[in-house]
A protein has these predicted regions:
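Non-heme di-metal
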Residues: 1-196
Length: 196
């Protein structure tokens, strides 16, 4: 593999690193808002996604460190990054839009450029991360729909609900106002899922 110095791939890796780093922080802020609004599970999902973005940023950063001639290096990038901090619903929609841009436009473009410049492993990283971003978008859209339709804590049929605090599980159309076991608020309930 050739060195990255002077390539478009180097700039794209830095853009991706900066974008993922900023997304991580935005999602951390969004988690706090979701928690304040009574959406514990959505807060946890924002935080989990923030952790995913941290890992993506690290992947891109390691490609830079591994493939430049000298460290430290300063890399100039010309890019736009979103600023958003509103309600949980608006934050979910903005997050979905950002994830969509990454997996449909940015990362496929960056992968193609990396491949053209002879960096197949970097191209592969962009493509694999794009697959994750696609799942992030789908999850954010589904959560936004639940918030919009008032279905975060209420469903059309009986389902299993689990308290995120103590693990109590009950079957009902909607989560209770308080957990019968630990007395934590409704905001601590989520759908019970066993996927192991």
């Amino acid at each position: 593999m050739g060195k990255l110095d002077g390539t478009r791939t180097l700039e794209n890796l830095m853009k991706a690193f900066a974008g993922e780093s900023q997304a991580r922080m935005r999602y951390t802020y969004f988690a706090s808002i979701a928690k304040k609004e009574g959406y514990e599970q959505i807060a946890a999902i924002f935080q989990e996604t923030a952790d995913n973005e941290k890992e993506h940023a690290e992947l891109f950063y390691k490609h830079i460190v591994k493939n430049v001639d000298e460290l430290p290096v300063t890399i100039h990038v010309d890019a736009d990054y979103p600023v958003e901090l509103r309600s949980t619903l608006e934050n979910l929609k903005a997050s979905a839009a950002g994830e969509n841009e990454e997996w449909t436009k940015l990362y496929p473009k960056f992968a193609n450029i990396a491949e053209e410049e002879g960096f197949k492993d970097i191209a592969n990283t962009f493509r694999q991360v794009a697959k994750v971003e696609e799942r992030h978008e789908a999850r954010y859209l589904k959560l936004a729909k639940n918030v919009e339709e008032g279905k975060v804590f209420k469903k059309d049929k009986k389902v299993l609900w689990k308290c995120r605090n103590c693990g109590y599980v009950l079957e009902a159309e909607e989560a209770p106002e308080k957990c019968p076991a630990c007395q934590h608020a409704r905001s601590y309930f989520e759908l019970f899922v066993e996927n192991y």
